[in-house]
C-alpha cells in the first residue's frame, strides 16, 4: 500500500498579543509565527484496513482518538469514497505541551499527507478550514510560511521578508496549563496599539518586536523561565522570549557557533535544548 514519510516542524511565536476575550470563551490574538527545524517524523501508510491506528510511544501522547493526528486522519477519511485503513507512526522530537505546536503540526502534516495518499486533492484553503476544527494552530502549519496570525490563529497573512536565524529552544520540563494561563491573564488593551511590521530586514529588527503577553502570568509562577531568558541573553542572544503559553523559551542568534554553545550550556542544566534554524 501507499506510504509517505513527512516532517512536522515546531513553531515559535515572535510575538503573541492577547487582544480581547470572545463571547465563545476563546481570545482574539495577534501573533507572528515562525517555523523552526525541530521536527517530529510522521509515517503514514494506507493499509487494507479497516480503521485508523496511531503509534507514538511517547509518554503523555495518546495513541487512539485522543490523539489530534488520529482525528485529522478521521476527518479526511470521512470525505473519501474509499475507506482504507490508515497507520500513522509518530517519532516525537518536539517536546510535548511546550508551547511549540508539536501536536498541531502533527495534525497538519497528517491532513496534508492523507489528502495526498487518498487522492482527495483538497486545496490548502479547505485543509485549513478542517484544521481549525482540530486546533487553532493547525492552519498555520498547513499555510507553511512565516505568518501574522489573527482571530484565534486561523486568519493568516504571509510575512514574506524575514531573515533566517539560529534559534535555541530550551524546555525546563515544568508543566504549564494553557487554560490556567489564560484564566489568570489581565487584559490591558495596550498591545492593540502596537503596529506590527509586514517585513523585517535583520534579526535585530525581529528582536525589536519580540513580546508575549502570557509571560506576565507564567514567569511569576515559574521563575525558571525568566532565568533561562536572562542566561540566553548573557550567552549572546540578540533576543529571547517564552513561546506560546510556555514553558519553552527560545532565543535568536545570528551565528551558529554561539547558538550551539548556548544549547550545550542549557543541556548541562538537564533541560531539553536544541540549536536549530528557522525554515
Swiss-Prot record:
Its EC number is 2.7.1.148. Pathway: Isoprenoid biosynthesis; isopentenyl diphosphate biosynthesis via DXP pathway; isopentenyl diphosphate from 1-deoxy-D-xylulose 5-phosphate: step 3/6. The active site is at residues 11, 137. ATP binds at residues 95-105. It catalyses: 4-CDP-2-C-methyl-D-erythritol + ATP = 4-CDP-2-C-methyl-D-erythritol 2-phosphate + ADP + H(+). It holds the Pfam family GHMP_kinases_N. The keyword Kinase applies. InterPro entries: GHMP_kinase_C_dom, GHMP_kinase_C_sf, GHMP_kinase_N_dom, IspE, Ribosomal_Su5_D2-typ_SF, Ribsml_uS5_D2-typ_fold_subgr. It comes from the Bacteria. Keywords: ATP-binding, Isoprene biosynthesis, Kinase, Nucleotide-binding, Transferase. One of its GO terms (molecular function) is 4-(cytidine 5'-diphospho)-2-C-methyl-D-erythritol kinase activity. The keyword Transferase applies. GO terms for biological process: isopentenyl diphosphate biosynthetic process, methylerythritol 4-phosphate pathway; terpenoid biosynthetic process. Belongs to the GHMP kinase family. IspE subfamily. Catalyzes the phosphorylation of the position 2 hydroxy group of 4-diphosphocytidyl-2C-methyl-D-erythritol. This is 4-diphosphocytidyl-2-C-methyl-D-erythritol kinase. It comes from Geobacter sulfurreducens (strain ATCC 51573 / DSM 12127 / PCA).
Amino acid at each position: 500500500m501507499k506510504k509517505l514519510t513527512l516532517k512536522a516542524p515546531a513553531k515559535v511565536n515572535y510575538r503573541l498579543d492577547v487582544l480581547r476575550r470572545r463571547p465563545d470563551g476563546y481570545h482574539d490574538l495577534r501573533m507572528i509565527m515562525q517555523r523552526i527545524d525541530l521536527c517530529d517524523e510522521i509515517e503514514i501508510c494506507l493499509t487494507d484496513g479497516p480503521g485508523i491506528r496511531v503509534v507514538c510511544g511517547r509518554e503523555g501522547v495518546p495513541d487512539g482518538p485522543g490523539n489530534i493526528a488520529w482525528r485529522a486522519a478521521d476527518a479526511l477519511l470521512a470525505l473519501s469514497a474509499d475507506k482504507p485503513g490508515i497507520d500513522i507512526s509518530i517519532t516525537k522530537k518536539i517536546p510535548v505541551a511546550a508551547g511549540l505546536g508539536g501536536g498541531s503540526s502533527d495534525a497538519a502534516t497528517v491532513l496534508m499527507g492523507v489528502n495526498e495518499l487518498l487522492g482527495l486533492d483538497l486545496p490548502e484553503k479547505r485543509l485549513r478550514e478542517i484544521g481549525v476544527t482540530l486546533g487553532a494552530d493547525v492552519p498555520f502549519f498547513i499555510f507553511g510560511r512565516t505568518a501574522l496570525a489573527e482571530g484565534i490563529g486561523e486568519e493568516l497573512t504571509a510575512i514574506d521578508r524575514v531573515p533566517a536565524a539560529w534559534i535555541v529552544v530550551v524546555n525546563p520540563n515544568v508543566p504549564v496549563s494553557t487554560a490556567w494561563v489564560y484564566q489568570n491573564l489581565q487584559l490591558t488593551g495596550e498591545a492593540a496599539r502596537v503596529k506590527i511590521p509586514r517585513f523585517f530586514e535583520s534579526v535585530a529588527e525581529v528582536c525589536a518586536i519580540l513580546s508575549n503577553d502570557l509571560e506576565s502570568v507564567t514567569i511569576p509562577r515559574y521563575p525558571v523561565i525568566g532565568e533561562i531568558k536572562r542566561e540566553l541573553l548573557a550567552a549572546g542572544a540578540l533576543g529571547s522570549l517564552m513561546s506560546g503559553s510556555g514553558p519553552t523559551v527560545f532565543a535568536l542568534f545570528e551565528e551558529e557557533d554561539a547558538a550551539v554553545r548556548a544549547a550545550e550550556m542549557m543541556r548541562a542544566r538537564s533541560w531539553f535544548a536544541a540549536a536549530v534554524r528557522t525554515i
